[in-house]
């Protein structure tokens, strides 16, 4: 269902090049790829300062990061007081052979 999604194309290209035997429908493969995308962003934010202190600081300073392995519109945000990277949800229902998204993206934050 997501084969032609813009976020899936880089994933498919990555697997074709680096992990051709990888199972594209295995959730753990997608999870690993998505987490690695987040790490790449943290390292970019670090610049040349790759100390543990700065890596941790940048990991706690992610703002509105969209990753190809997440549903469209779901964003990663962290702060010094909130390390949970994902606090949004998208409702969907199964329609015979595919999942259909419906409604707006909802906040999973308490009181959100």
Q: Where are each of the predicted segments found?
A:
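Extracytosolic ligand-binding ectodomains
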Residues: 1-112
């Amino acid at each position: 269902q997501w084969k032609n999604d813009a976020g899936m194309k880089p994933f498919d290209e990555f697997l074709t090049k680096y992990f051709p035997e990888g199972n594209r429908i295995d959730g753990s493969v997608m999870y690993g790829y998505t987490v690695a995308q987040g790490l790449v962003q943290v390292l970019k934010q670090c610049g040349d300062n790759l100390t543990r202190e700065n890596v941790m600081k940048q990991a706690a300073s992610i703002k509105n990061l969209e990753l190809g392995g997440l549903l469209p519109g779901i964003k990663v945000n962290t702060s010094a007081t909130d390390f949970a990277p994902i606090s949004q949800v998208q409702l969907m229902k199964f329609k015979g052979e595919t999942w259909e998204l419906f409604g707006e993206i909802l906040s999973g934050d308490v009181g959100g």
